[in-house]
């Protein structure tokens, strides 16, 4: 399977991009992790609404980056630029660059479909397809041309194990995913994402609709997943950001107000507005 999917993940290297003039907001200690995403001077508008302003942000491989900030600050808009889902909004326009492994994802030669193979997404509300658990997991691999049932069976088991839900569901694979609890549905959605072997997983408030026990399970899963994947998570939950993330970016009014190691953001922020937000003075 890995070889088959890898063949679908080859991106043209026919042109390079000059990044020498850019400036990034980056934590002081990168812990030797490589930059996988580099956002450079990004602005975004919904019609006349200037939703993101001069965003400069480096995301590091195999780390969990939390995106925090009050409602309407641009958090969800930002992560939807990372896989270009934001382009589904007709009035949207952008300026600046987002480099994914040194390639500008806004370049017309860059494949949007390829990007979404490399960068999976888990949404706020669990959104399984109205199909069996098995068909949910195999949906992506089948689109990529995998038809062999033995291979598909292996993908299902591997993905559900990766989402820490195989033991719960291994005898129910042909049950409709809608019959599961909210927490189980969300982990099936994570497994569906893992089935296409992404490098990055975007999570937009992945536990906000879940009960505390399901939330804890998803948080534990996210911590395990960073061994193989880069995780970028939007959350309103300050305690969650502090518990699970390595880096935290605080967005405010469309800007990155502060970006640093999570421990520093929550113990000794550099910016007064960051301190006010995480201490609950506004938000």
Swiss-Prot record:
<protein>
    <recommendedName>
        <fullName>Phosphate import ATP-binding protein PstB</fullName>
        <ecNumber>7.3.2.1</ecNumber>
    </recommendedName>
</protein>
<keyword id="KW-0592">Phosphate transport</keyword>
<dbReference type="InterPro" id="IPR027417">
    <property type="entry name" value="P-loop_NTPase"/>
</dbReference>
<keyword id="KW-1278">Translocase</keyword>
<dbReference type="InterPro" id="IPR003439">
    <property type="entry name" value="ABC_transporter-like_ATP-bd"/>
</dbReference>
<keyword id="KW-0547">Nucleotide-binding</keyword>
<dbReference type="GO" id="GO:0015415">
    <property type="term" value="F:ATPase-coupled phosphate ion transmembrane transporter activity"/>
</dbReference>
<comment type="subunit">
    <text>The complex is composed of two ATP-binding proteins (PstB), two transmembrane proteins (PstC and PstA) and a solute-binding protein (PstS).</text>
</comment>
<keyword id="KW-0067">ATP-binding</keyword>
<dbReference type="InterPro" id="IPR005670">
    <property type="entry name" value="PstB-like"/>
</dbReference>
<dbReference type="GO" id="GO:0035435">
    <property type="term" value="P:phosphate ion transmembrane transport"/>
</dbReference>
<feature type="region of interest" description="Disordered">
    <location>
        <begin position="1"/>
        <end position="32"/>
    </location>
</feature>
<feature type="binding site">
    <location>
        <begin position="69"/>
        <end position="76"/>
    </location>
    <ligand>
        <name>ATP</name>
    </ligand>
</feature>
<keyword id="KW-1003">Cell membrane</keyword>
<feature type="compositionally biased region" description="Polar residues">
    <location>
        <begin position="1"/>
        <end position="20"/>
    </location>
</feature>
<dbReference type="InterPro" id="IPR003593">
    <property type="entry name" value="AAA+_ATPase"/>
</dbReference>
<dbReference type="GO" id="GO:0016887">
    <property type="term" value="F:ATP hydrolysis activity"/>
</dbReference>
<feature type="domain" description="ABC transporter">
    <location>
        <begin position="37"/>
        <end position="278"/>
    </location>
</feature>
<keyword id="KW-0472">Membrane</keyword>
<dbReference type="Pfam" id="PF00005">
    <property type="entry name" value="ABC_tran"/>
</dbReference>
<dbReference type="GO" id="GO:0005524">
    <property type="term" value="F:ATP binding"/>
</dbReference>
<comment type="similarity">
    <text>Belongs to the ABC transporter superfamily. Phosphate importer (TC 3.A.1.7) family.</text>
</comment>
<dbReference type="GO" id="GO:0005886">
    <property type="term" value="C:plasma membrane"/>
</dbReference>
<keyword id="KW-0813">Transport</keyword>
<comment type="function">
    <text>Part of the ABC transporter complex PstSACB involved in phosphate import. Responsible for energy coupling to the transport system.</text>
</comment>
<dbReference type="InterPro" id="IPR017871">
    <property type="entry name" value="ABC_transporter-like_CS"/>
</dbReference>
């Amino acid at each position: 399977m890995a070889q088959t999917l890898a063949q679908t993940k080859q991106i043209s290297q026919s042109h390079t991009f000059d990044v020498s003039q850019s400036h990034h907001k980056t934590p002081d200690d990168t812990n030797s992790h490589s930059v996988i995403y580099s956002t450079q001077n990004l602005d975004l508008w919904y019609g006349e609404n200037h939703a993101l302003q001069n965003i400069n942000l480096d995301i590091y491989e195999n780390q969990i980056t939390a995106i925090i900030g009050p409602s309407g600050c641009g958090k969800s808009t930002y992560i939807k630029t990372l896989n270009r889902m934001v382009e589904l909004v007709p009035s949207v326009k952008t300026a600046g660059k987002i480099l994914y492994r040194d390639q500008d994802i806004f370049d017309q030669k860059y494949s949007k479909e390829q990007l979404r193979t490399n960068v999976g997404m888990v949404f706020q509300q669990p959104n399984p397809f109205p199909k069996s658990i098995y068909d949910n997991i195999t949906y992506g691999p089948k689109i990529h041309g995998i038809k062999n049932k033995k291979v598909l069976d292996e993908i299902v088991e591997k993905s559900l194990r990766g989402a820490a839900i195989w033991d719960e569901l291994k005898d129910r694979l042909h049950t409709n995913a809608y019959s599961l609890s909210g927490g189980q549905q969300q982990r099936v959605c994570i497994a569906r994402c893992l089935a296409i072997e992404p490098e990055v997983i975007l999570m937009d408030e992945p536990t906000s609709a879940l009960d505390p026990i399901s939330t804890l399970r998803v948080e534990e899963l996210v911590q395990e997943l960073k061994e193989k994947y880069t995780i970028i998570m939007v959350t309103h939950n300050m305690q969650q950001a502090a518990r699970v993330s390595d880096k935290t970016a605080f967005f405010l009014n469309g800007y990155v107000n502060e970006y640093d190691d999570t421990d520093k953001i929550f113990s000794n922020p550099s910016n007064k507005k960051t301190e006010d937000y995480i201490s609950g003075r506004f938000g």
